[in-house]
Structures are given as structure tokens and as C-alpha cells.
Amino acid sequence: MLPSGFPRQASAYVEVAGVKINFSMPHVESIGLGGGSIVRVGDSEVTVGPDSVGHYLSTKARVFGGDVLTATDISVAAGQDIGTKDLVKDVSLRTVTLAEAKIKALVERVVDQMKTSPEPLPVLLVGGGSVIAPKIIAGVSEVIQPPFHSVANAVGAAISKIGGTVDIIQNTAEQTIAQITEKAKQMAVDRAVAAGAKRDTVTLAEVDAMPLQYVVNQVRVIARAVGEFSSDAFYSDAAVNNFSAEDDDEIYSEESVKQSQASIIDPRPIVDVDTYRPNVVNNPKTGIPEWFITETDVEWLAEGCYVLGCAGGGSPFSEYIKLRDILRAGHTIRVIDSSSMKDSDVIYWGGHMGSPAVSNERLSANETEESMRELMEYLRHDSFDVAMSLEIGGANGLQPLLVGSSKHFDRPTVDADWMGRAYPTYWQTTICVYEPGQLVPCALASGDGKAMIMTKTTNDEIVDRALRAACTEMGSRVGMTAKPTTKKKVIKYSVLNTVSLAWRIGRCIARAKKHNTSSTVAEQIIDEVGGPDSAKVLFRGKIIGVERRLWKGHSYGEITIQQVADDELESASASGYKTVATGGVLKIPFKNENIYAKHVKDDGTEDIVACVPDLIAVLDTQSGKALGVPEYRYGVMVTVLGITCSPRWSDTPKGLEIGGPAAMGYKDVVYKPLGNYVEPKSVVLEYAPPK
């Protein structure tokens, strides 16, 4: 619960029963523990739950004359005054002690999962089952049981607010998205008032505008408004009589059919984040140190790639699932340092092309692998030596690991890429900065049988423009493989050690989750990438506006972030580094990736606090994870992080021409370096065993 009295909203990534869902909801962690939890006594241990007698507690619990030992019986045996205490006097002290210890461990674990800060916090216990909770809980400063705690649900229902929801699809040909959004907001407010809310108390709880994929000039707008109940609201007897008490009783008296369900067990081994070491071994044939990727590595790489994606590159989640399943099937994935390549190596590189919004709703197939096979056939290459990423940001950062796995080509991935981040086009690569003409010949594949090859061009930009048009016709998502490259060009022109950087950022997020320091994960990432001279916290606040539209295979739009009042913050001591901007709002336009961060002060003055080619990442404050364009949502608390780009972009006028704000259509924005770049440390070389 926040100081404002409202529950804390779940992060941008919401899971129910381990399944990710795209709904906004309060942050809830559930465990199988309550007053009806069944207690079983064994020779060496006592278990509590997760099965329960449920609503039969008053007849099946021993203190009520039943024959099932429950958590309530344990509480009564320990001194609580519920039911008939004499009915549990035969429960041994050992059973009570072990059961209470088990209950305490379960409660402490779920409390720890809810915290985003290691500091002790007060805990409010409500509900009938709260009587079984311990009075002293680790990590808790105070345990509070308010009056009427056993009927908290009824109290909550009595004071709940009245809501109004609007979900409409509108044509943007004759009206702007802003006009449509304002219309939806007003409709939501009017519906809340019509439902019985006081108009002067109504506020907007959620606003989201989403362009419809594959349909021109259509946008879906959702608006939800809530307000306090008005006692002056009039309800007819007919409306009240529409609810049948008899029907209600009949529904709730039905006995649910119990089905035997297998437990879902995550086969991932439990890893100590603080002591984990990547598996780097020397190849017995070549002597080259090779990093064999594990499930833990894949998880950290996916998180780190999304941060480096600057909201673009596509969500890496589906690619993470693919890589995880490849590893579980017994295949191997290898990464090597750039210095380990041979001068004669043929290096294939590529990735996905298309809108991140489309990639969020459409699972990838083998588009990139198929495009590589098409180009290999055209160039008459039987295979290649090394795989490389187009961009480390987003899902594309994981593509070379997929195609290089032993399931496909069984080739190592080099620890480098052509961007050091994510960009919306293929010509915005460092190889195009220093050696134009390296994109063709290239191949495109849709994953469903369609493919094409482009053999010649007059400039690099036309390659992306032509293939982007084809991409739109092929479903707005394809795989692309560009002209193979060499070791010399990788060493000279690429951004090195970016796979290592993604892994280290992902480790920061995992470590923050373990130690309940997710609210300061931005500071931990800053320390990892080189310190406050290399990266900065730009802003903290809440997303209050999201605009999106699809055009020519790109996601365009802007988010607005507002600094929030203290009563909406979970902890006043959440930050470690001072933010670059405070007060007012921060506006971030995007074209697949975030372009710049403009601070609009309360007096209306504006200042660009960061822009491309520097990296601008929007992190979910609660989880510490990166938000991409598809995850931008009204009401999410965020931290905006800026990271200095590689000098491959900023050292030459050509680099700024291709990767700067002018290339994104903002010629009036002048690039000012955020700080000094520090090259990431190679994971392969750091953890390589001695030869």
C-alpha cells in the first residue's frame, strides 16, 4: 500500500500463475496458506498446505468438531481463542512449533517477494486467516492487525469507487489521436458519473492508445475513470430486482469438481546471483576460450538486451523461450571474443526487420535463419565461420545465438555488434559509417515461404527503404541477412563486447531482484557501465501519456512522463544518484527506439537532456526491467536511464549524420554527449581459464 492509501500497481510485467498477461492490476503475490490450510505431521517434518479445507473450515477443523488438522487448529493450540480449545489439547508441542516455523517461513518469503527495498517495512494483516500469521516477521518493522481485520473484504467493497470504461476503435484519417483520446477520456468520465460517481472526484486510472496492426488509420483507445460513490445517485427498484438472491445462492452452493492436476515445476536450477560464474572453457582443438551459454546466461542476456534496445529491437521474451528450449533439448550455444577470430573467417550477420508492436503480438519463426540460407545459396557458401548480431538491442541481440546454436549452424557468436544499441534501420550501423556499401547482397525471408534477394544499390539508405516496403507487404516482420563481413572490419568498425555488456546489465537486474533493490537498479547499471561519468538517471516519474502509430514498418509515437507526488512513491529514499531533471514532465518521442528526452519544466521552458546516438532506456521502477514500445502504458512508474554511446557514433560527423537526431527527422536537435564512453569488459576473457 502506498502512502496515498491506494494499493501499489503491479509492474509493467504482470504474471498470473506464472503466465505473463497484458493487464493492469494491483501487485498481488499469492501462496497456498490460510486458516484452512491442512497440516500434515510426518516422522521428520510438518507440512502446511498448500491444499485447504476452504469454506468447510467451520465443520472440518478440529476446533470446530471436525477431524482435519488445520493451520487454525495450530493457532488455537498456540494460544488463540477460536472454537473449542480442548479439542486440540492433544496436539504435541513439537507439532505446534514445527508448524508455526513453517507458517513463518512461508509468510516471510512472500513478504520478501513484495518488497522493492531491503529496509524493514510495516505489514498490515487482514482477513480471517490473518490469525495464523506470526507476530514477528523478518524484514518487517511492525505487524498491524486493524479493527475489523477479519471482514476486510466487506469493508473494501463498501468503500470501493465507481468506474467507467471506454474501449473504442476510431479512424485517424479525419481526426488526430489526441482528439480521439480526449473523446474517450470524456466518455469514460461520463460513464463513471452515470454509474453513480461524484463528478468532482472522478480521475482517470488508465488511458492507452494502440494502433491496429495490418489496418490503415485505425487506432484502439481504452480509457478507465474512477470516482467516489455519490449517495445522491438514483437507482430504480427494477434495477435492484434484476439480481436474484436465489440464483446467486444456487451458483455459490454448487460443489466444484476437483481434478487432479500435476504440479508445474520450473526445471531451472536455483542460482546464487552473487557467486555465479559463466562457463568459459578452452576449446581442446583450437585452444580458443569459448563461453558456453546456460539458461541463467540467456535470462540475463535477454534482460540486458532489452535495456540496450532503448525501447526497440523487439521484445526478447519469445527469443529467450526459444533459446531456453534449445538448451533443454541438449544443444549448445557458444560466444567467443573478437580477438579469437581468424583473419579468414566468414562472418554472417543479420536480424529481424519490422515494427516492435507487431513483434509483440506475432511470434517469430525461423526468419533470420531462412534469410541466411537464402544468402548462402546465392553466394554459394556451404556454411560460415562466425555469427554476429546486427544490433545488441532487443530481440535482435539474441538472433546470432539462435542461428549459431548446434540446433542450426553450430557456429560461435562473436562478442560484438554494429550498433551498441538498437536503431530502426539497417543503414544506421557503424559499418555504414566507416565503409558504405556493405549491406548488399542481402536476403529477406518472411518465415512462411517468401524470400527475396537484393543484389545492388547506389546507397545504403535505399536498401532499408526498399526492403522495408517489402517487409510491410510480407507481414511487417521478416528476417534479413546482410553481406558477410570479416574479422578486420569487425575489429575496426563494430562496437565490441556488447554481448558481455548485455549480460552484465541482466545480472544487475537479477541481483536487484534478489536483494530487493529493484528501485535502484538504474544506479547499479550505471556502476556497471562505467559510473556516473558514463551514464545518468535522467528522470523519475509516471507515464501519463502514450501515443503510437504504425507507418512503413515502424512504430512512431511519444510518451509523456510526469514527476509524481511523494504520496505516490513507495520509498522516499529510493534513489542513489541525483536525476538530471526534476519537476515538470519528460517527453520521449520514438521511432521504434527512443530518440531524445525533452524536459518541460513547470514554467514551460524546455531542455533536451539526452538524445541519440546516446542510449535512452525507460525502466520499470518496480521490477528494474526495461520497457519497450509495446509495454509503454499509462500509470506505470518508470526511471529513465541515459547511457553514453560508443565513440564509433560520436567521433565523426558521418557517425552523427547517420546515428544522430537529424537522421531521425529532428534536424533542430543538437547532440551533446551525455558523458564518456567506457568499453565493456569481455566476459570471455575475464572468466577464461588459463591455457
PLM region descriptions:
Residues V151, A158-V280, E547-K691:
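C-terminal non-catalytic interaction/assembly regions of soluble proteins
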Residues G42-Y56, A61-F64, A71-A78, E299-G351, ...:
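N-terminal low-complexity or amphipathic/hydrophobic leaders
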Residues R507-E570:
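Oxyanion-binding "anion nests"
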Residues M1, I132-P134, V151-A154, S315-E319, ...:
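Short glycine/serine/threonine-rich phosphate/pyrophosphate-binding segments
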Residues Y434-S518:
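Core active-site phosphate/anionic-ligand binding loop and the adjoining beta-turn-alpha structural block
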Residues L2-G34, H149-K161, K322, R328, ...:
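Catalytic or ion-translocation cores adjacent to nucleophile or general acid/base/metal-coordination motifs
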Residues L2-T201, A205-E246:
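Helical "lid/coupling" subdomains associated with nucleotide-phosphate turnover
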Residues S338-S383:
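Glycine-rich oxoanion-binding loops at beta->alpha junctions
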